[in-house]
Amino acid sequence: MRLTALTVSGFKNLKDVSLHPDTHYNVIVGENAQGKTNLLEAIWILSGCRSFRGTRERDYLCFADSGPMQIQAAFDDGRRVQTITCTMQPSAGKEKRFLLNGIPVTSTGSLFDLFHCVAFTPEDLALINEGPEVRRNFVDLCYSQLTPRAVGAVRRYQMILQQRNAVLKQALPAAAAQAYLDVWDRQLAKTGAYLTVQRSRYLQQLAAVCTELYGAISAQQEAVTLRYQANVFGRDPDFSDCTEEQLAAQYYEKLVRAREEDRALGFTTCGVHRDEMQILINGVSAREFGSQGQKKSLALTLRLAHAQIYARKWKQTPLILLDDVMGELD
């Protein structure tokens, strides 16, 4: 994946930027608060994803200008050059609109499938320091770039989970509650089993590549280990002898057994939304015992490992965006 041209206007503090990047490596230098990270963020937004900085969309518009925002990039995926445009009008509800080769895009999922980026920022320390949800989201985003249908499965799971939790919060008669829950449990089990398999397969690949990359970074002095703690199926589950139908049946049975507790608590206590990816250095928790430099090296390793896995899968390297990559590395 090569970025061949980029124009940005009216995005945060970037009033009028036009670039024709080198096809291999580009280094952006400048004083603090000049817009270096904003430039990377603008490129990332064209993938159809939310800002990697958590920026609210209404804050995309230029600080010192009341005009519209436009981000446009031409990219070469090895087959042809295409153009993605993102616009936002101050007077149109501050909603993003995308064009692909001049044609309106109705689903940002199509951009996610076309324009692949891997971004590393200092905020990626959250992959190590924060709770399990951050790591689950990271893994889901990564395998979704390898298996496009998984994007819909992740969204579907969240929708079904919300519906199940809504039933759990209602003061329904026992028979009615069981009937409603059975409908949602069967759907949740099917989708949850699929996502568990996707996470397991991806994490096996990620663990192998991370071991290699982190070994090189640490001059073979430290070893990194990734463990998948699947809430329904246990640590590092082996699904080689199971079909998804069999896994869905096991998942469903666990949901059924948890119904009474879930009704008492008002939420779903088991499922892939409670999975964890544990990261260890030399056998101990990186989150609890790692230095700041080790944690940043690990976060960078996770991002670069995914880029390598992506390249193997699709026979092309994604666009890699690195922000302040050298600070605080051991």
What do the PLM-derived regions correspond to, one by one?
Residues 110-117, 121-190, 315:
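A conserved P-loop NTPase coupling/switch region
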Residues 25, 43, 122-124, 283:
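ABC ATPase nucleotide-binding domain signature
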